[in-house]
């Protein structure tokens, strides 16, 4: 019976890890496109295109995107540590975001037992949105330009199942 449980846990882990987005290596063409693209700052989750919010919902594993539950606005309270003061607060908080005519770059922190910082790049149009690349930043980055540079240089690590 112990062997069956171990096999079940192993299979479940494999399924869960495969269902999450993996950091994609940027092609040379996409890297150059992002370098040259003009991005405008987005200061709120509600300022992101609906498709990008849907993409975040998929990354977070949410059934229905709820700003109050899934990600806090910049500077708002969230569950930054495993010492939960208010379980109603979201586990994530937006730090910065920027969008161009066809891409959005989202940078947020994720609380819990360890505070981590995550980056997600989405290609978006009014018709469709797709996750392009992203991962865990090696440390807190100071500016959205630093976030873009981390993405372009390939210094992001795999976020695994924890987005």
Model regions: which residues?
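Short beta-strand elements that form the blades of beta-propeller/WD-repeat-like
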Residues: 103-109
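Flexible low-complexity loop/turn motifs enriched in small/helix-breaking residues
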Residues: 19-102, 135-163
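Structural motif
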Residues: 114-120
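Bacterial N-terminal signal peptides
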Residues: 6-17
């Amino acid at each position: 019976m112990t062997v069956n449980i171990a096999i079940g846990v192993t299979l479940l882990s494999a399924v869960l890890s495969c269902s999450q987005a993996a950091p994609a290596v940027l092609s040379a063409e996409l890297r150059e496109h992002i370098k040259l693209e003009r991005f405008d700052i987005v200061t709120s989750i509600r300022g992101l295109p609906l498709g990008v919010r849907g993409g975040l919902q998929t990354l977070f594993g949410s059934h229905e995107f709820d700003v109050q539950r899934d990600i806090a606005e910049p500077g708002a309270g969230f569950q930054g540590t495993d010492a939960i003061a208010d379980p109603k607060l979201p586990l994530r908080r937006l730090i910065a975001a920027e969008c161009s005519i066809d891409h959005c770059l989202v940078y947020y922190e994720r609380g819990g037992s360890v505070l981590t910082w995550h980056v997600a790049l989405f290609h978006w149009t009014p018709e469709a949105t797709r996750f392009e690349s992203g991962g865990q930043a090696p440390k807190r980055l100071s500016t959205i330009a630093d976030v873009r540079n981390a993405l372009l240089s390939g210094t992001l690590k795999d976020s695994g199942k924890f987005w």
